[in-house]
Curated annotation (Swiss-Prot):
GO terms for molecular function: nickel cation binding. UreD, UreF and UreG form a complex that acts as a GTP-hydrolysis-dependent molecular chaperone, activating the urease apoprotein by helping to assemble the nickel containing metallocenter of UreC. The UreE protein probably delivers the nickel. Keywords: Chaperone, Cytoplasm, Nickel insertion. It is found in: Cytoplasm. InterPro entries: UreF, UreF_sf. It comes from Ureaplasma parvum serovar 3 (strain ATCC 700970). Required for maturation of urease via the functional incorporation of the urease nickel metallocenter. Belongs to the UreF family. This is Urease accessory protein UreF. One of its GO terms (cellular component) is cytoplasm. The gene is ureF. It comes from the Bacteria.
Amino acid sequence: MTLNSDYLNLLDLMQITNANFPIGTFSHSFGVETYIRKDIVFDGESLIKALLLYMNEQLLHGDLLAIYQIFKLLPKQKINAIWEIDQMINFQGLARETREGQRRIGQQMVKIYNELFNCELLVEYAERIKNKKSYGNPAVAFALLAMHLKIDLKTALYTHLYSTVAALTQNCVRAIPLGQVKGQKIIYQLKHVYFDDIVNKVFTLDFKTDFCKNIPGLEIAQMEHEDTPVRLFMS
């Protein structure tokens, strides 16, 4: 007896967004470690503020808007425009560690996705990365697989938002430290209070003017992290 394909797709989605999925997210704080080192982030409330800053700026205008755009482009077979998103999101990253971290995570996602699933566009993506025509990006890889699994846009946005924030929260909880139960409470609060607002914002954005918009403070923290002599994270 085999499972219904809809359930299988859901389980596949749960597998690839699990915190234990080996794509290297446990190695990155995306600048939050700088805030921790400066005692700007030191407890649960200050961590929530930092996570909201990341979610409402880089994650919203970067990953989530990229996923939204790819869901619009792929049904129209505008494949080259999807590869352009990979290049744009890479070039817009000013902080070297964060840019390279996203690239490594994206490349690892493409590699493992291709070992698990039979998706022609992900195979093409891997070839483009190998031939240095594309860089590799988590949002691009995830959007391609989500569409392959017939996941609807809103589910894809919520899932990517959750998996990214959950991984980052767990990393920060280790660094402060706060304890795993406190980390789970933070994730629960973010889901129930803020996720709807962030996902709904995606549908109000204009790709041409809003893609990769960011605020200086977060990128400065990410760039300062490059000169941190003792650190827990690669970014």
